[in-house]
Each structure stands twice: as C-alpha cells, then as structure tokens.
A protein has these predicted regions:
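Active-site hotspot residues in diverse enzymes, especially metal/ion-binding acidic/histidine motifs
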Residues: 1-190
Length: 190
C-alpha cells in the first residue's frame, strides 16, 4: 500500500482517536493516510491477521475507487484534515453503503482472485464440485451468534489465503463453490 499507492500506513487505537467504537480502518484522502485499528495488528494479535489483511485491502480499495470522488468535494480539504475526521471510516457493524460494498469487493478480488481460489479448491477437494454446506451451516447457526456462519472448508482456505474465515465464506458462496442454502425441490426432477 505504501509503495504501490503512495499511501502512509499507520496503526492506532481508532476508537480512542475518533471517539467511536468498532472502527476497523479509516482513510484520510488529503494526507494520503490509511489507519488500521491497532487491535488488528498481526504481530500483536496473530488471530486477527486475516481481518487486518482484508481491512488494509478494503482501505486500498477506497483509495483506488473513491479518492477522486471525495477529493473533488470542495469542502473536503477543510472538513477532512488529518487532525480532524477521516474522509472514510469503516466499522465492523456498519450497514454497507455502495462505497463500502465496492471496497469489500475490491479487497475480495485482490486477496482471493477467482483463478487461485478455484485452483486451491481443486487441490484440496479433488475437483470443482460444489459443496452442499446447508447442514453444516445450520449446525453452526445453532451454536453461534455470528451473522455469517463459516464452514470448515472456508476456514481451511482462509488460512491458506491469509484472510478471515468470514471473508472466505462470502467469496466461496459468491463463486458458487459453497451452496449455503438447500435448493427448493424441483417439480420435474427425480
């Protein structure tokens, strides 16, 4: 991010810095600065490496896709100075607007390219057959309060790609490699 995009990367306690909870990353467009919450720092918290990588790629996505839009707003220079509020704030509980959805998609494609995902899927599963995960997902839902249940195969692949299990689960479902819901019965099959 620093060399490829010319951005400065910092780690900080974003809840304290910005006075709000659950902030994972923030971008200051004018100063070309990306700040990731220190709770995600992989050397201090190895279990958060996947979340750190995805958050960093997500913020890079904002820079690549949205910096020009935000920089074109006349008030931006005075409104969003490094000493005040960031141009973009990303929260873990935030409802996804189009910019957040686009940055998530950018991060997903960057960290989990389709050809590499399909190649590794083939390697560990012996082919490209879809995994019918609805029974495993129902069992996970019964034991967990997480909004997106993560299957074991998604966890295994997440470790290989160094992303979070949740990010991998979403990507695998998007590529139709994991079927999360049981299909409706077809009247004409059988």
């Amino acid at each position: 991010v620093e060399s490829a995009l010319g951005l400065t990367l910092e780690l900080d306690d974003l809840s304290k810095r910005l006075g709000a909870q659950d902030i994972l990353g923030a971008t200051w467009i004018q100063s070309k600065t990306v700040v990731i919450d220190q709770s995600l720092e992989p050397s201090e918290n190895p279990a958060m490496e996947g979340r750190f990588n995805f958050t960093l790629a997500h913020e890079a996505g904002h820079w690549v896709m949205h910096a020009h839009q935000i920089a074109d707003i006349p008030e931006q220079a005075t409104l969003f100075d490094i000493s005040t509020a960031p141009s973009i704030v990303c929260r873990s509980s935030q409802r996804k607007d189009s910019m957040e959805w686009q940055a998530d998609r950018f991060a997903s494609y960057l960290l989990m390219p389709e050809d590499r995902i399909r190649s590794y899927w083939r390697e560990i599963r012996g082919g490209l057959d879809q995994y019918m995960a609805f029974e495993e997902i129902e069992a996970i839902k019964a034991q967990s309060e997480y909004p997106i249940p993560v299957t074991q195969v998604a966890k295994d692949m997440a470790e290989h790609f160094r992303v979070s299990g949740q990010a991998m689960q979403i990507r695998l479902e998007g590529l139709k490699l994991i079927l999360a819901e049981q299909p409706e019965p077809d009247l004409f099959s059988g």
